[in-house]
């Protein structure tokens, strides 16, 4: 085991040696099928396993108000099986799903008809003319009965069972603002199973246990709310963004009860089409191996109308914004955010370097100013740190003493203003570039994380953007970062949040 660890460390050390440090050549081979399906392969001859991923270009950006979290919910539903996987008697179950669809359509019609009576009119969610109608109660009872009958005919976790039975490991799924992905690591001779299951999931998913699965999201949301910082971070997201869906969390309490099979089916049928899908394989396969196999399972799918593009766009930055957050459970802090561009914009790679170079420097400045606290600089919104649309860079300072909030904010703002006028020491920038380069080469030797980065860049912009993105980080200078700060770290693009104990006066 010690020898293996030594060899692994040696491999990374060799990868980041100066002789090859700036070589980001990614041997990605691509084939685009007639129906628009994109296949990306990195061939690693001799490897006996294959990392397999399927990315769909859809996520929270594509949701509508009142349905926040619906994309994440769709991911859960797509684990419930298909017409061929997950049923003990599909013909009988099929009839129940048809009845469920009809009952839900009638329920939606009744909810719409009663919209004025049911509308929530209270700021504190405390006033409706009526909470229900007899017709609504009857339809919900019918849906519950049909659900129970259908559930008796379903099998739990059918797709997972098949993957595990044939040597699959690391089965995961993720839905974020811009993508949904499913992935698995399989033995070389079982890769065809991935194609069989994912093609079936893409065309024939059955939304079993719909209402029971809804409660899983409720539990996840409650888990998020148990973390003291969750609501503050969400409030900061809302402060920064007024129009972009990138800042919206995975559903509020009211959203979970609004999800309908009709809306989930609309998302599914709109976005899960071959011309909105990318397959990625890294391991002991070749492009020539994969092309006929992919054609076998996905080739019959028709190219469908292009899914509607995301049109949300933030207004131009025009004013400083501020949030005072009262909490006795969350540590006092100051957080300053600035909107930054999305991947594909030439400025975006520089923010990675700026964050890495400026964090340690800012920590030293804060300490020298007599402020006790910890600095963290990141570009995270909800769970993700890069987007194809504008998001934010977040300068966070968690304090030991709430009485230092004013002093801490002043020190932060002064140093941010200085950053736009005076370049950082060149050695800090060089160190940041080396740090990012090391992180990348650790990614490059791990097929799972490498495949994710390729897929993520494809949905944000293009997989071809990844290599120049890395090269741009390597070329960043202290003057580049000074110009970047001068352009973006301005008052009209600034959102400031402070966390105060509840007893501290205004």
What are these regions (language model features)?
Residues 1-5:
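Positively charged n-region of N-terminal signal peptides that target proteins for export
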Residues 7-18:
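Bacterial N-terminal signal peptides
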Residues 19-23:
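Boundary at the C-terminal end of the N-terminal hydrophobic targeting segment
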Residues 42, 47-63, 69-73, 85-200, ...:
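M16 family metallopeptidases and their MPP-like homologs
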Residues 68-76, 80, 356:
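Active-site recognition of the HExxH zinc-binding catalytic motif
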Residues 201, 205-209, 218, 222-229, ...:
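An aromatic/glycine/proline-enriched structural segment found at the starts
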Residues 259-266:
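A conserved hydrophobic secondary-structure block that centers on an alpha-helix together
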